């Protein structure tokens, strides 16, 4: 196993799913998981890594079901964006309690709650070792938080998007349904598309590919996995050119 004395990334974009925050409850935010994630992010900051974070909102709101029931998709997506802001507030609070300087930015203006998203301000904060939480997706309906992660990753000039999931990486098939599924250590963007592997939605994935932004998929539920990823150890699946 390769072990580096120094991190292999200087600036990362960490994509957390909303579901990752809910733990075994099935809904809402599990405070113990939130605090563990804050501690893992703190470790990265102490290593000198600049950290941007995008969080989904699926633990608080899922628009798909309501869309089927007749709700306007734009309204549902706006509600989903607000759910990501709520998760961002919780993460900012957890980081502050862990004595980590963190700033929450939103793609839709919410004066008095958090800062408006500014690309230049985000980069300035990162350079000053502040964790920047980027909420409300892209600010537009019809785009996922994976798209937001890739877009913000490109904007802040991140070295990589680290997509935290509930599985160890990208597999040949769904490991929950197929016990013979094996995990890929590395893939190219083309291989992911050819094999129709579920990494991200197509809009997000092609955005990353077109801008040569590497993606690493790993299991955030595995203690220490995030640190191992940034130290260049064998963890998860790396997707590059």
UniProtKB/Swiss-Prot annotation:
Regulation: Allosterically activated by GTP. Inhibited by UTP.
Keywords: Allosteric enzyme, ATP-binding, Cytoplasm, Kinase, Nucleotide-binding, Pyrimidine biosynthesis, Transferase
Listed pathway(s): Pyrimidine metabolism; CTP biosynthesis via de novo pathway; UDP from UMP (UMPK route): step 1/1
Gene Ontology molecular-function annotations: ATP binding; UMP kinase activity
Residue intervals passing through the bilayer: none
Binding site for UMP: 57, 77, 138-145
Compartments, as annotated in UniProt: Cytoplasm
Binding site for ATP: 15-18, 58, 62, 165, 171, 174
Positions of region (Involved in allosteric activation by GTP): 23-28
Reaction equation(s) it catalyzes: UMP + ATP = UDP + ADP
GO biological process, one term: UDP biosynthetic process
NCBIfam families: pyrH_bact
Subunit structure: Homohexamer.
Protein name (database record): Uridylate kinase
Provenance organism: Klebsiella pneumoniae subsp. pneumoniae (strain ATCC 700721 / MGH 78578)
